[in-house]
Amino acid sequence: TICHIQISKTHGILKTCEENSCYKMSVRGWIIGRGCGCPSAVRPRQVQCCTSDKCNY
C-alpha cells in the first residue's frame, strides 16, 4: 500500500508500506499524523484507517 507519511506540520512524503493499510490521525478536526498501518487511538485522538493507495491524504 502507498501511504502519505507526515514529516512535519507542512511537509509529507509518499511511502510504499509493508502494511496493507494507511491511517490519518486527528484531534478536533486537525490532522496531526498520517502513516502506515492502523494504530489504536486514545481520546481525544481519532484514527481513520483505509486500505487503498494514497487514501489517507
Curated annotation (Swiss-Prot):
Q: Kindly list the GO CC terms recorded for this protein.
A: extracellular region
The entry's localization annotation reads: Secreted
Task: Tell me which tissues or organs this protein is expressed in.
Answer: Expressed by the venom gland.
Could you list this entry's UniProt keywords, alphabetically sorted.
Disulfide bond, G-protein coupled acetylcholine receptor impairing toxin, G-protein coupled receptor impairing toxin, Neurotoxin, Postsynaptic neurotoxin, Secreted, Toxin
Q: Which InterPro entries match?
A: Snake_3FTx (IPR003571), Snake_toxin-like_sf (IPR045860), Snake_toxin_con_site (IPR018354), Toxin_cobra-type (IPR054131)
- Sequence intervals crossing the membrane: none
Q: List the disulfide bonds.
A: C3-C22, C17-C36, C38-C49, C50-C55
What use does biotechnology make of this protein?
Answer: It should provide a tool for further understanding of the effect of M2R in various arteries and may position itself as a new drug candidate in cardio-vascular diseases.
Which Pfam families does the protein's record reference? Answer: Toxin_cobra-type (PF21947)
Q: Which GO terms describe its molecular function?
A: toxin activity
What's this protein's family per the entry?
Belongs to the three-finger toxin family. Short-chain subfamily.
Q: What does this protein do?
A: When tested on muscarinic GPCR, specifically antagonizes the type 2 receptor (CHRM2) subtype (Ki/Kd=120-399 nM). Ex vivo, it reverses the M2R-agonist-induced relaxation in rat and human arteries.
Additional record remark: Negative results: does not show activity on the muscarinic type 1, 3, 4 and 5 receptor subtypes (CHRM1, CHRM3, CHRM4, and CHRM5) at concentrations up to 100 uM.
| The protein's name in its UniProt record | Dendroaspis polylepis MT9
Species annotation:
Dendroaspis polylepis polylepis (Black mamba)
